[in-house]
């Protein structure tokens, strides 16, 4: 990101504050009304990890997409940049796919296949660069990059969806790993994509207040697929693909463990043998069922049962570690790709 003068920097700052404020305030003030509405309509699910098994409203996806859409539309009319549109349409399509799955349990193949559609706006609007930033330089891969986009959006969308198993994990994970992504986009990407990353980050900050332990609302598939797909779209349009992969390593590892153990793409609600079990004092323990899939949670519980909040904090520590690795990678890229110049 290159600034020709101080006025450009000031303008980016003003736009950044504007984007952050719209996204945050929309989600923050609309979410309590959504919680009340969902409770009134009986759109709730039980939180099985709590002693009283409270009924928690779901989904939060509609409020998230409202805040993100409103902000990105405003940003588009301020910048008229096709990358903003590509990120917006990717987020909307991912949300629609998720809300369908929220309303009706779809087969395991539905989300990864349907999310291919969410990748199309990036391709159709040409909102990508075929020069892939690597750690020690970049690679020009025009033919390979298109299939990579078609793979990346479904993978990242489902990765965030798969790790959303405990209070606050999906939103907290996006916040932690969003920091290196924003920094990378600021350095290697464009002003417009950086503004979009602020939209995602501050919308998620507002949502985390309601999603953190103990959750007042769950994101649902519409929320997690939206967050994951938008994260992926920002990484692609902001020339920060490798940084995103490094930051998301714990979540990617979780998906890899799950798929390698069940050996097929399956909806998590179809799994009969759960990877974790509840003790009498409502702590989570690793399942002893040989048929249960291997997941990140199950591995973290090998040393013994943990409370839900303790387990969430362990996942966040992994996210912090992978994000630090991503930040180190940014420093290396900064010197090898840009020669130490922004």
Regions found by a protein language model. Give the residues of each.
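Membrane-proximal soluble regions of multi-pass membrane proteins
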Residues: 255-309
């Amino acid at each position: 990101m290159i600034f020709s003068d101080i006025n450009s920097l000031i303008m980016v700052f003003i736009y950044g504050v504007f984007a952050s404020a719209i996204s945050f305030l929309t989600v923050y003030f609309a979410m309590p009304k959504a919680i009340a509405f969902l409770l009134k309509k009986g759109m709730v699910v039980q939180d099985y990890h709590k002693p009283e098994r409270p009924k928690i409203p779901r989904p939060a996806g509609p409020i998230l997409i409202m805040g993100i859409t409103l902000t990105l539309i405003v940003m588009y009319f301020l910048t008229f940049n096709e990358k903003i549109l590509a990120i917006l349409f990717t987020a909307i399509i991912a949300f629609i796919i998720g809300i369908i799955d929220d309303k009706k349990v779809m087969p395991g193949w539905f989300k990864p296949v349907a999310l291919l559609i969410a990748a199309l706006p990036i391709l159709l609007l040409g909102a990508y660069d075929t020069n892939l930033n690597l750690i020690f330089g970049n690679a020009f891969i025009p033919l390979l990059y298109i299939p990579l986009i078609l793979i990346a959006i479904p993978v990242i969308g489902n990765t965030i969806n798969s790790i959303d198993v405990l209070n606050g994990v999906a939103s907290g994970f996006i916040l932690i790993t969003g920091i290196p992504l924003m920094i990378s986009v600021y350095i290697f990407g464009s002003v417009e994509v950086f503004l979009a990353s602020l939209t995602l980050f501050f919308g998620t900050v507002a949502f985390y207040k309601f999603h953190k332990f103990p959750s007042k609302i769950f994101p649902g598939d519409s929320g997690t697929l939206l967050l994951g797909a938008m994260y992926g779209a920002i990484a692609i349009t902001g020339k920060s693909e490798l940084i995103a992969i490094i930051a998301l390593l714990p979540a990617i590892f979780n998906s890899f463990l799950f798929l390698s153990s069940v050996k097929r793409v399956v909806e998590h609600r179809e799994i009969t043998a759960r990877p974790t079990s509840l003790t009498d004092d409502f702590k989570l323990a690793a399942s002893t069922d040989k048929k249960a899939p291997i997941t990140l949670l199950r591995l973290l519980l090998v040393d013994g049962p943990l409370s839900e909040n303790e387990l969430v904090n362990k996942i966040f520590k992994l996210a912090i570690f992978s994000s630090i690795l991503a930040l180190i990678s940014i420093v290396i890229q900064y010197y090898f790709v840009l020669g130490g110049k922004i």
